[in-house]
Amino acid sequence: MDNKLDVFRRELVDVQGIPLFWSIAEQWSQVESFEARPDDILISTYPKSGTTWISEILDLIYNNGDAEKCKRDAIYRRVPFMELIIPGITNGVEMLNNMQSPRLVKTHLPVQLLPSSFWKNDCKMIYVARNAKDVAVSYYYFHQMAKMHPEPGTWEEFLEKFMAGQVSFGPWYDHVKGWWEKRKEYRILYLFYEDMKEDPKCEIQKVLKFLEKDIPEEVVNKILYHSSFSVMKANPSANYTTMMKEEMDQSVSPFMRKGISGDWKNQFTVAQYEKFEEDYVKKMEESTLKFRSEI
């Protein structure tokens, strides 16, 4: 495609019942046949749930807390977004195929769309879930600056789409529940964004235990410092400022916007909150999953 701008702001395309970027849908066979390796670590989240944060933590762990090594490249190349394929711009599958093991692999796919090779290889997976209201707000601002998404419309219009699952990667509700159930069968560490905000050191220790890595206290403290929001926000290899403006326009909204829990209270009207909560209870009542909307 000659004009790179042709790839942006296009409508989503349905893949097995899930709306995805048109370019992922076009190249779906390439994603579906992705070959996982047994020592891959998969990072899975619904969008705007702390993906970049946990990715940076894992890269710091794999580099023994050496922040300079983690500045070797942008986070989206150190931890490739497996299914993201944009003609002439990026191809997550190809990037990963060219990487040496052990690889850190990022995905936003719901559990039913994950390439089967991850299950066959019994890969370790880390899932991070964040409360729905904060995700909806963050996703709205992300749509404004990340041009692979369709135009979000007004906040009210976007919230309706979010509740209906008519956003990229489908319904938040099914996504978090699907991965929650799957953890009973496979090696999945299920973390909560709110716990990571409240006690990041404790959550990093959980990750280390899951990965069977024993590292000294001073290295853990380094990881804690270099993965903090303020340090990452100022770090060009973590904050996506190296991405071209046509793809992500940070003058519209920064990629790392606030990084807090409870910001939804600044966005939702009382009527929106009541409608959202009523709908939420119906969709989540049969699940054992419990979220905190603030800390």
Swiss-Prot record:
Enzyme class label: transferase
Chief location category: cytoplasm
GO biological process per UniProt: catecholamine metabolic process; lipid metabolic process; sulfate assimilation; sulfation
Keyword vocabulary terms for this entry: Catecholamine metabolism, Cytoplasm, Lipid metabolism, Transferase
Matching InterPro entries: P-loop_NTPase (IPR027417), Sulfotransferase_dom (IPR000863)
Keyword hit for Lipid metabolism: yes
Protein name as it appears in the record: Sulfotransferase 1 family member D1
Organism field: Rattus norvegicus (Rat)
Gene name as annotated: Sult1d1
